[in-house]
Structures are given as structure tokens and as C-alpha cells.
A protein has these predicted regions:
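Catalytic-core helical/loop segments in enzymes performing group transfer/polymerization on anionic/lipid-linked
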Residues: 1-520
Length: 520
């Protein structure tokens, strides 16, 4: 192994080849170091947030979890850069990580107004009209619009039409006006650049806390540039927030895609104005993992969050209702009382016969994100692991399928295409029945929840340290065949390949019953 080289991203793995990556496998930031840093960063920000007494500043701080996440990601790569300089490593990186090693903080100064859209305002208007007709059902649409406005059960809707949202709308006979966020937030909003810096002192307090660590994460970081950029962001967010408080609003707002920055500020401002804002889960997150950090970033600003059924609701409440932030925001979990997701998703395994046993490996997103709540969930760690899993499955004579995420094809393309028997890029819902068994290396994906709700055999590479929800873990182990794994030196996932092979055999021949307290 050439210890003087650090392969920094998937671009280099693709360019140099998977064997080169294996021969030079190394990452300077261990799991323990990274978790320690992110926990410190998040807890510092949370403390400032909880101490905030100004409602507007509190709301904007909720919004700016997004920028905290950006800072954490960039400082992760700053550690790598500093380590390579101190220990005379050569960093090999491509376009994927170049902007993280050499960040242009100014590009983060706008949250809404520098965002490009695929469609013109006119096209968005036409799409809005069509969505209103299609999703409200044409007869239902005509029936409702002929009534006086006072008799309509009306709601404004933003975000995609998920199955949960659709069920909620139809069950409650809601006439939904579907809008794109661009119809609510537009470039005509005047940005007031005169911030009361005393009110927004959390910026300097948070950054000073990071600087005080004096470690490789923060060495050489342009904190003045970060602060300047952040204050510009806050000016824009503050102006948009004030605008949203003053515009005419419906009684009810229905929201999906809550992580979208525009959806988030609309949700927060409308909630503050007394609008009944109802938000919807993706539908396949059963809360079998405790993902507190990402949950706070994406969900904890909501007052109402709808999940499929009472069991899943209890799973969420058990983990997240104790969070101080959710106690302050008043987050409530609501159930649609769907008996089980299996019926809801209609993903029962069909009878079929393959000439050769097919095993589908679910690929990890090959991006630059490193998840903190879970163990070993970083693309370079997972590429290394997936390669060894593929080789083992091939050596056992199985037909190996690699399932790439449809939105991540450019990232993973060219890595495993020639190694596996079938490279799958279709939606998972369309291919779940085209295999004999599914292997996961991570559970922080809605694909895992969707598979739990089927009767497909599942084998999970379970890395030590995964924060399973203790309320559901016993039931989960009756449904999923767990293969224990560790993070060697905090950077390489290792598991017993013979035990893995045995688990594959057992899982394929098992019969599955749905486990009630998983909510499937």
C-alpha cells in the first residue's frame, strides 16, 4: 500500500480503478474523530438555539441547520487537507471534492434567489393548473369549485404528491391548490441588508466555539469569510421570512420534501403565523434507527408530521419526542392508521423461478456526505465494502445485481458495471421482485423500510455502533439476518465472509411473517 496517497473521491476511484483504490485504501479521519467533531458542532449550535428568546431569530436558526451541515462537511475535508500536508500525503481528487477542499464561501451567500429552476414562470403556472386538475380528480375538482369558497375544505400544497399526502387529501376531501415554492418566494422580494448583529450573535458564538478546538478540522479555515457569507444569508432569509409573515395565507398548508430550504422557510413562517401546517414522511422510514442529528436538521422544525400508522408513530415518539428542540417547537407525530405498509405499498413478493439465484446489493450513495448518526456510512468506506461483497457473492456462484440510486447514477457509474451480472438503475419499487434476496450495507435509506414491508429475504451488514431503536430491534432481528461488522481503525468495515455466506443460505430458505411492532 502506498501510504503517501489519499484517494479522496469517487472520481479518482473511477479514473484509477477499484484495484488501485483497494491498494491505496486510507482515510485520515476516523469514525470516532468525525463523530466527536460533528457532535460538538451540533450540540454547540443546539445550545445557542435553545437559549434564543427571540421568535424570529429562533425560526431563522432552525432554517440554518442547513448551513451548519455545509460547514461540517467542508471542515471534514479540511481535516484531510491539513493531514495530507502535515504527513506528506498526496491528495488525489476530482471535481466532486475540489470545491470542498477549496471552498468559495461566497457561493453559499444566497439561499433562494440564486437557485436555478428547470422551468420558466409560465411553464410552472401551467404545471400548477394541470396538477390541480389531475390530483384533485376532475369531477371532484368541478364539484368543489362550483361551491362557495366558504364551503371548501381548502389547503395550499407544496412539494411532491407522495402516497401519504395523497391519502390524507382524499380521506379528508381536501381541495388542494398545488403551488411551486417559486410562486410564494420570488426575486421581487427586497433584501434588507441591515441586520441587527446583536440579535444574530449566535453566528460569532458558534464560529468562535469551532475555532477554539484548534485542531485539523479548523486549521487554516477562513472564519471571517464564513461569517461574512452567513450574515448575507441571514439578510436574505430574514427578508423572505418577513415577507412570508405579511402575505395572505390559507388556513392549511400541506408539505412534502421538508428538507428543501424554500419549503422549510415557508413551513416555519406559516407555522409562526398560525397556519395549520401538516407535513408528511416519505412513508418508508419506520424509525428503526435513531438518527437524531439528521432528524433535527430536517424534521424538528415541524409542528405536525404524518406517518403511516400508530406503530411507526410510537417509534418516532420514542426516539425524538424527548429532544429539547422538539419540546420547544412542539413537534407532534400523527398517524394515518394504515394497517401495515405492506398493504399500502403493495409490494408482496411474487412467485418466480430464476435459473440462477439472484442477489441484489443496494448501493450506498457515492457522494461526499458522511452520515454521523449511523456507523461507517461514508461513500469511500462503502465502495470498499461493496467491492468485497460483490467478489464474495460471485465466488459463491450467485447472479449479482447492483442497485444504484436513480438520482446518483453519474456518481457510481463506471465503478461496478463490469463486475456485476446486472447493473440496475430503475426505481426500486419496479425491481424489488426481480431478485431472490437483498443485501444492505446501510439502513439509513427508505429503501430499507420498503423492503421490510415486503417478504423479500434481507441480509444486513450491521456495523457496530449503529444506533438501532431499542423499541424495534428485537422485532427487526426476526425479520433481518444481521451480519456483525466492525470499523477497523475507524475507517474500514470488516466482517466474517464465511458467516455472511451462511446467512445468505439461511435467509434464502426462510419464510417471513410481518412483524407487527415494526409497523410493516
Amino acid at each position: 500500500m502506498n501510504k503517501k496517497v489519499i484517494v479522496c473521491d469517487i472520481d479518482i476511484v473511477r479514473k484509477k480503478g477499484i484495484s488501485y483504490f483497494q491498494d491505496n485504501y486510507f482515510w485520515p479521519v476516523s469514525e470516532h474523530e468525525y463523530k466527536d467533531f460533528v457532535n460538538f458542532s451540533t450540540e454547540t449550535y443546539n445550545s445557542l438555539l435553545l437559549d434564543c428568546k427571540d421568535n424570529k431569530v429562533f425560526d431563522i436558526m432552525l432554517q440554518e441547520y442547513q448551513f451548519v451541515d455545509t460547514i461540517q462537511k467542508i471542515l471534514h475535508y479540511n481535516y484531510v487537507k491539513n493531514y495530507s500536508h502535515e504527513h506528506e500525503f498526496t491528495m488525489l481528487y476530482g471535481d466532486q471534492t475540489k470545491s470542498l477542499f477549496f471552498p468559495d464561501w461566497e457561493k453559499f451567500s444566497s439561499v433562494f434567489f440564486k437557485t436555478t429552476t428547470r422551468y420558466t414562470e409560465f411553464i410552472l403556472f401551467i404545471k400548477r393548473i394541470l396538477k390541480n386538475i389531475i390530483f384533485n380528480k376532475f369531477k371532484f375538482f368541478l364539484k368543489k369549485v362550483l361551491k362557495p369558497a366558504s364551503e371548501l375544505n381548502f389547503a395550499l400544497c407544496i412539494g411532491s404528491m407522495s402516497d401519504l399526502k395523497k391519502t390524507y387529501i382524499y380521506d379528508n376531501e381536501i381541495y388542494c391548490d398545488h403551488k411551486y415554492w417559486n410562486h410564494i418566494i420570488n426575486s421581487k422580494i427586497k433584501v434588507d441588508n441591515e441586520l441587527d448583529l446583536n440579535k444574530y450573535s449566535f453566528v460569532s458564538s458558534y464560529l468562535d466555539a469551532l475555532k477554539s478546538r484548534n485542531d485539523l478540522f479548523v486549521k487554516g479555515v477562513d472564519f471571517r469569510g464564513i461569517e461574512k457569507t452567513w450574515l448575507k444569508r441571514l439578510s436574505e432569509i430574514s427578508s423572505v421570512y418577513d415577507h412570508l409573515l405579511t402575505i395572505e395565507k390559507p388556513k392549511t398548508l400541506l408539505v412534502t420534501d421538508q428538507a428543501n430550504p424554500a419549503h422549510k422557510i415557508i413551513t416555519i413562517a406559516f407555522q409562526r403565523s398560525g397556519v395549520d401546517v401538516v407535513c408528511f414522511s416519505h412513508g418508508n422510514n419506520l424509525a428503526v434507527l435513531n438518527q437524531t442529528i439528521i432528524h433535527q436538521f430536517v424534521i424538528s422544525h415541524l409542528k405536525k408530521y404524518v406517518v403511516p400508522n400508530e406503530t411507526i408513530k410510537k417509534n418516532y415518539e420514542y426516539i425524538y419526542s424527548v429532544l429539547p428542540i422538539e419540546k420547544k417547537t412542539g413537534t407532534r407525530y400523527l398517524s394515518l392508521n394504515i394497517p401495515n405498509i405492506n398493504q399500502y405499498n403493495n409490494c408482496q413478493k411474487k412467485q418466480r423461478t430464476f435459473e440462477k439465484t439472484k442477489i441484489m446489493l443496494i448501493g450506498f450513495p457515492a457522494n461526499t456526505n458522511r452520515l454521523t448518526d449511523t456507523a461507517g456510512d461514508f461513500s469511500l468506506f462503502k465502495i470498499d465494502l461493496e467491492y468485497r461483497i460483490i467478489l464474495k457473492l460471485k465466488s459463491l456462484g450467485y447472479f449479482v445485481q447492483y442497485k444504484a440510486h436513480p438520482d446518483r447514477l453519474d456518481e457510481i457509474s463506471g465503478i461496478f458495471n463490469q463486475l456485476v451480472d446486472e447493473y440496475i438503475s430503475e426505481r426500486f419499487e419496479n425491481v424489488i421482485n426481480n431478485t431472490d434476496l437483498i443485501v444492505f450495507t446501510h439502513a439509513a435509506t427508505t429503501t430499507f423500510g420498503y423492503t421490510l414491508a415486503s417478504n423479500q429475504p434481507i441480509v444486513m451488514i450491521n456495523v457496530k455502533g449503529n444506533p438501532w431503536n431499542e423499541l424495534t430491534y428485537d422485532a427487526l432481528t426476526k425479520r433481518v439476518h444481521m451480519v456483525p461488522a466492525i470499523l477497523n481503525n475507524g475507517i474500514r468495515i470488516e466482517f466474517d465472509q464465511n458467516y455472511f455466506a451462511e446467512k445468505i443460505k439461511v435467509a434464502i430458505n426462510s419464510k417471513y411473517k410481518y412483524v407487527a411492532n415494526l409497523g410493516v
